Amino acid sequence: MAVWTKNVHKLIPSFGIRFSQRSSVDEIDVQRLNRLADVWWNEDGEMRLLHSMNKLRIKFIVNGLVNTGRITQKDYNKPEPLEGMKLLDVGCGGGILAEPLARLGANTTGLDAGKDLIDVAKVHAAKDPALAARLCYMHNTIEEHADHNKETYDAVVASEVIEHVADKKIFVDRCVATLKDAIRMPM
């Protein structure tokens, strides 16, 4: 993960990857991940690595938001340090990262191209009624979402996602398009 400015798209070389002008979605990878939907929330199963990394990822994101001035050190020590922030979790899968971000006070939108994963995320989130007002899951691509949500979010998180993206330039450009002006992005 890194913290990037709105000009991040200028920093990513192509590495010989052919960029599609239409979508960043790797359909084969989406299908593969969708097949894991039933085990997504099993902390001892195939997703155990994501679960085990979560505390570290959350701390990294919150620290990144402090370091970029989005939240203060005073906010950092509150039970809900992200209160009032609008976050987009792109490639949220079954919601392993989106749920704790919402519990920390952020109004969180989880976005994924995998319908089965979004369905699992919604079912799991419904077990905690406190999340209902702060967490929304959407089955969509970043391209579609960005077209209707320009300069909407305080931060965009794309954790453990870039390696699953077919067109990295389009992906990052569309993520950045959803950010409010002069905001940085933990990714």
Task: Show the residue positions of the predicted features.
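Short hydrophobic/aromatic-rich motifs at helix boundaries and adjacent loops
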Residues: D29-R35, R70, G93-G94, D147
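N-terminal, positively charged/glycine-rich alpha-helical extensions of SAM-dependent methyltransferases
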Residues: A2-M47, H51, K55
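A general structural signal marking secondary-structure boundaries and capping sites
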Residues: A37-W40, D44, L65, G69, ...
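Solvent-exposed, charged/polar functional surfaces in cytosolic regulatory/catalytic domains
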Residues: R32, L36-W40, F60, G64, ...
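Conserved alpha-helix/loop element of class I SAM-dependent methyltransferases that forms part
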Residues: S52-E83
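Conserved SAM-binding loop
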Residues: Q73-M187
